[in-house]
Amino acid sequence: MSFGDIVVQARQRIGLSQKHLASQLRKEDGSPISAQYLHDIEKGRRNPPPPPLLDQLAQALNLPPDYLYYAAGELPQDLREAGLGPEQVHKVFGALRDELKSGHKT
């Protein structure tokens, strides 16, 4: 499932229109994102948004932030700031792969 598909499903699950959700999300300058920008994200025409918008999306959609970061191919800020070395990152992702292969959902 793509990042856009996740956003669409979560948005529809809680009954929000694109316009309403977009009005809740703020760019760095404090202005709301456009419904067109959100539409493009949902359709995969734009890359997933930057971390500050991922956090806002997670809150607005009642999703765990880590789930959206994972779907967007991003590391959450606390992990980026932790200064993990290559071996630690490899170990964490290896554990996740092992968990997925064993059929368990994390």
Residue locations for each model-derived region?
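A short, Lys/Arg-rich alpha-helix, primarily the initiator
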Residues: 1-16, 23
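Interfacial/linker helices and their anchor residues that mediate assembly or domain coupling
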Residues: 72-106
